[in-house]
Amino acid sequence: MLFGKRKRRVKRVLIIEDEPLTAFDNEVMLRDAGYDVVATHDDFEEAVAALDRETVDLILSDVRLRGKRTGIQLAEEARKRGVPLLFVTGHPPDNARDLAIGCLMKPYSERQLKQALDAVDQHLAGKQPKLPKGLEIYAPRDAAN
């Protein structure tokens, strides 16, 4: 289709964020952009339970979560399951490159968030995306899947 929209690889997003206002804003922004937000949670256990019951194309996760476990452990679990995870944080962990497909630095705007998900989608499709300010892509495509 010459001028049509390209088919998205990332449609179903799981949001994991410990700040309620940020979680709400992310959910609204992504739903408005046409993504299916399968769930929004603030801790590791709820995130894993959502992964057990839902098909997820991408996890959008902060590093700091409610409870004892962190986004780092969630990224390890996501990697085992073959689900790409994009960190959204102001302080990415030293080993983020080994765990996630990339990182969008906080604070970010609605536009940056949407552009970041589009860039991840293009990356997963094998394309060289234009990266918005604050986004770094880490993983080769095959490492995310």
Mark where each language-model region is:
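Non-catalytic signal-transmission and effector/linker regions of two-component phosphorelay proteins
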Residues: 1-12, 109-145
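Conserved acidic carboxylate
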Residues: 17
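Two-component/phosphorelay signaling modules centered on CheY-like receiver
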Residues: 20-39
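Acidic, metal-coordinating helix/loop segments flanking the phosphotransfer/catalytic sites
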Residues: 27, 40-58, 66
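Conserved phosphotransfer cores of two-component systems
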Residues: 52-54, 77-83
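Conserved phosphotransfer microenvironments
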Residues: 61-79
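A Lys-centered signature of the CheY-like receiver
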Residues: 106
